[in-house]
Amino acid sequence: MSSILLGVNIDHVATLRNARGTKYPDPVHAAEIAERAGAAGITIHLREDRRHIKDRDVRILRETLQTRMNLEMAVTDEMVGIALETKPEFVCLVPEKREELTTEGGLNVSGQLEKVKAATQKLTEAGIKVSLFIDADKEQIDAAVECGAPFIELHTGAYADAETEEAQQDELKKIAAGASYAASKGLIVNAGHGLTYHNVEAIAALPEIYELNIGHSIMGRAMFDGLEKAVADMHRIMLGARK
């Protein structure tokens, strides 16, 4: 079975920094440690309200990352403009509501097909690889294909938040079916949202999954074990699921 990559989301380093309006902890330093520990890429979400990652972080990380940047962003003219100026290796288009604590669901690509398609085309023409953050739903997967995005990221939030083992298994089956269907359509399949050290193994074991993007649980573990160990431990669990 092929290997699997870990993308580390460092948004919550910025959340902690912004809580006091200080210059520390610096997401740039966190990215350096995560890369050293085995991260294949660094994910950051530049939200419209700038609640954690700031424009300054995007600029500096683009210059300093040794791996690659995955810039999560809403489908707006402002964000597309920032991406075209910054030119990250990857952009992941996500839904966004100002009142939410975190991204609550997948992007409704089929419901705004022309808008997403236009953004995807602009970014692709600039040499940026585009991923769409969607639920494991055939309609959304088909819409992603129509948009011309080479990657999707399957939303694993319902799986992660399931309150019973039966419910979690049902969600896992949906993700597995979605990953298989997307791969059959020629898409490269990533996944993420809500994944922890306790629930990641089953998702990592799905053969179609190319990369997992994980942040909150790694940063939580890092408070006690240190960031380098937290990243390395997550990567080890993921790789173990592929043996």
UniProtKB/Swiss-Prot annotation:
Q: Do you know which Pfam families this protein is assigned to? A: PdxJ
- Kindly state which reaction or reactions the protein catalyses: 3-amino-2-oxopropyl phosphate + 1-deoxy-D-xylulose 5-phosphate = pyridoxine 5'-phosphate + phosphate + 2 H2O + H(+)
Q: What is its EC number?
A: 2.6.99.2
Which organism does this record belong to?
Answer: Aliivibrio fischeri (strain ATCC 700601 / ES114) (Vibrio fischeri)
Q: Which residues catalyse the reaction?
A: H45, E72, H193
Q: What is this protein called?
A: Pyridoxine 5'-phosphate synthase
Q: List the residues marked with site Transition state stabilizer.
A: E153
- Give the gene symbol: pdxJ
Tell me the residue numbers annotated for binding 3-amino-2-oxopropyl phosphate.
N9, R20, G194, G215, H216
Where 1-deoxy-D-xylulose 5-phosphate binds, per the record, is at D11, H12, R47, H52, T102
Enumerate the Gene Ontology biological process terms: pyridoxine biosynthetic process
Per UniProt, subcellular location reads as: Cytoplasm
Q: Where is the signal peptide?
A: none
Keyword Transferase listed? The answer is yes
State whether keyword Cytoplasm applies.
Answer: yes
